[in-house]
Curated annotation (Swiss-Prot):
InterPro entries: ATP_synth_OSCP/delta_N_sf, ATPase_OSCP/d_CS, ATPase_OSCP/dsu. The keyword Cell membrane applies. One of its GO terms (molecular function) is proton-transporting ATP synthase activity, rotational mechanism. F-type ATPases have 2 components, F(1) - the catalytic core - and F(0) - the membrane proton channel. F(1) has five subunits: alpha(3), beta(3), gamma(1), delta(1), epsilon(1). F(0) has three main subunits: a(1), b(2) and c(10-14). The alpha and beta chains form an alternating ring which encloses part of the gamma chain. F(1) is attached to F(0) by a central stalk formed by the gamma and epsilon chains, while a peripheral stalk is formed by the delta and b chains. This is ATP synthase subunit delta. It is a peripheral membrane protein. Transmembrane segments: none annotated. Its main location: membrane. Keywords: ATP synthesis, Cell inner membrane, Cell membrane, CF(1), Hydrogen ion transport, Ion transport, Membrane, Transport. F(1)F(0) ATP synthase produces ATP from ADP in the presence of a proton or sodium gradient. F-type ATPases consist of two structural domains, F(1) containing the extramembraneous catalytic core and F(0) containing the membrane proton channel, linked together by a central stalk and a peripheral stalk. During catalysis, ATP synthesis in the catalytic domain of F(1) is coupled via a rotary mechanism of the central stalk subunits to proton translocation. It comes from Aeromonas hydrophila subsp. hydrophila (strain ATCC 7966 / DSM 30187 / BCRC 13018 / CCUG 14551 / JCM 1027 / KCTC 2358 / NCIMB 9240 / NCTC 8049). One of its GO terms (cellular component) is plasma membrane.
């Protein structure tokens, strides 16, 4: 997956910088999202990975996307087709979203708990993370009974393991060393 990210990042960065410069970040996000859905279509996926000439592939792709892509979006598709990179469009979108989140000072936080969290607990976790990270935090909450009790929080590079399972694992490691 990191190879896809490495390939996708320059395209996403170029598109994002262009979008910011032209105050069209949301429009570009929509265009790229639509193009990524087209790229994930099985028939198109087979064309992208087949032996179709880049120019012809770009024309087919742009034709399918129609008015969903403006002139600049079409140019990006053509460049990616010429370089044989249309298959990484979903990764380009993921990178673009990450750049947008950084611009908007937002971060996604995965909160995994042993039991269902109440709305108040979610609000407390969100407020604490926003204060600690100095960013707007969006929570993705899920449950995992194997944690026994407590909460595991992952936000970017930050991992907070307040679970009983995590504490037991750390104690076992300490006893073995």
């Amino acid at each position: 997956m990191s190879e896809l990210t490495t390939i996708a990042r320059p395209y996403a960065k170029a598109a994002f910088e262009f979008a910011v410069e032209h105050k069209a970040v949301d429009q570009w996000l929509g265009m790229l999202g639509f193009a990524a859905q087209v790229a994930e279509n099985e028939t198109i996926h087979n064309l992208v990975n087949g032996s179709v000439a880049a120019e012809e592939l770009a024309s087919i792709f742009v034709g399918i996307c129609g008015e969903q892509l403006d002139e600049h979006g079409q140019n990006l598709i053509r460049v990616m087709a010429e370089n044989g990179r249309l298959g990484v469009l979903p990764a380009v979108v993921a990178e673009f979203v990450a750049f947008k989140a950084e611009l908007d000072k937002e971060v996604q936080a995965d909160v995994i708990s042993a039991i269902e969290l109440t709305d108040q607990q979610k609000a407390n976790i969100q407020a604490s993370l926003e204060q600690r990270l100095a960013r707007k935090v969006k929570l993705n909450c899920s449950m995992d009974a194997s944690l026994m009790a407590g909460v595991l929080i992952k936000a970017g590079d930050l991992v907070i393991d307040g679970t009983v399972r995590g504490k037991l694992d750390r104690m076992a490691d300490a006893l073995q060393s």
